């Protein structure tokens, strides 16, 4: 394990992190330019159209990925109350190398999850309402991916009441 990766793990253990922030990237706040300034040019860039909006996806792999991460994917383009913001981070997906983000490390870093789902394939997903989804392997010990987004409600809000007559 490299020294930087070890420091990263220790930092996560020592201080609880906001689920929607990792490695200087916070969905809904961080811009394309800020990601480029911090991580450089991506290994791969695509421009998918999602729900009619032009979006941007950057993938950092191999030597371009942060220490301890096999692949980091940053999706840009966020629909906000103020309109569509093509330069804001929508999602950050981390695919850690084995043993980088074990279940206890994730819980120590982000706290107790708000919900847990057991998947049909034997894996599990831990969900934090402030924007983190952590997928764990069949043994339930090692994370296979961490997906960070803007905070999400666990239960959809009720539709507004019909106007009174």
Predicted segments — roles?
Residues 1-8:
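Sec-dependent signal peptide recognition
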Residues 30-165:
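A cross-family detector of function-defining hotspots
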